[in-house]
């Protein structure tokens, strides 16, 4: 199987490259990519100086869509073309890094440990995203904000398993996407609030507390 590389500034568009296979425990193909928001929706673009990229989007109690109830989303991109983010508080299991590397045909010797796998959102659930702390820099690493980055090079997987990768990381399957102006409309309707992101919340493995911690940060900001 192969790997997709797709990192672009501003609105992100997937450029077809190699596609990456993943171990059966994930039951999906892992494709590390940054994507645009879903088509459709309102037509009012986000102001250039109001980007939420690198921040956390937190569902309010008014949001009753079961796909997003009490979700915390790390925003990857947000501009006039739409918005895209990853749900970070819906873990679905773990995957052995060595098994994943074997699926990729990569050398798994000297590799140990697991990656925490999350439900990243309802859009394109066959795509995967590696989110990690920004002290690691590979060939295709892109720092999004809040000390958080994404890397499209599969070498990040081996680095994580060999102990030379980022301090903290997670794997998300699928993403949340918004058309131009759609997210702004949902925020005005009181369905979301945004707060500053940091690794303590993003990579907190106590998913039951992430939403509460993020909402508490909103109170502090106010």
What does each of the following model-derived ranges do?
Residues 1-16:
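N-terminal secretory signal peptides that target proteins for export/translocation
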Residues 2, 21, 33-222:
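A short aromatic-anchored loop/beta-hairpin motif
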Residues 12-17, 21-37:
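Bacterial N-terminal signal peptides
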């Amino acid at each position: 199987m192969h790997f997709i590389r797709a990192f672009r500034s501003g609105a992100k568009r997937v450029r077809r490259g190699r596609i990456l296979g993943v171990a059966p425990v994930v039951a999906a193909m892992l494709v590390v990519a940054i994507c645009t928001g879903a088509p459709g929706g309102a037509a009012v673009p986000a102001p250039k100086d109001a980007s939420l990229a690198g921040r956390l989007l937190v569902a309010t109690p008014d949001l009753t869509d079961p796909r997003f109830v009490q979700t915390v989303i790390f925003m990857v991109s947000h501009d006039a073309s739409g918005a895209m983010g990853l749900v970070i508080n819906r873990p679905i299991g773990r995957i052995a890094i060595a098994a994943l590397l074997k699926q990729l045909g990569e050398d798994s010797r000297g590799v140990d440990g697991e990656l925490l796998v999350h439900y990243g959102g309802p859009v394109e659930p066959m795509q995967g995203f590696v989110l990690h702390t920004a002290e690691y820099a590979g060939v295709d690493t892109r720092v999004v904000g809040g000390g958080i980055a994404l890397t499209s090079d599969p070498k990040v997987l081996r680095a994580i398993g060999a102990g030379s990768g980022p301090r903290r990381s997670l794997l998300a399957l699928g993403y949340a996407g918004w058309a131009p102006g759609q997210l702004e409309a949902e925020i005005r309707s009181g369905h979301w609030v945004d707060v500053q992101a940091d690794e303590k919340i993003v990579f907190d493995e106590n998913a039951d507390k992430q939403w509460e911690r993020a909402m508490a940060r909103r109170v502090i900001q106010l």
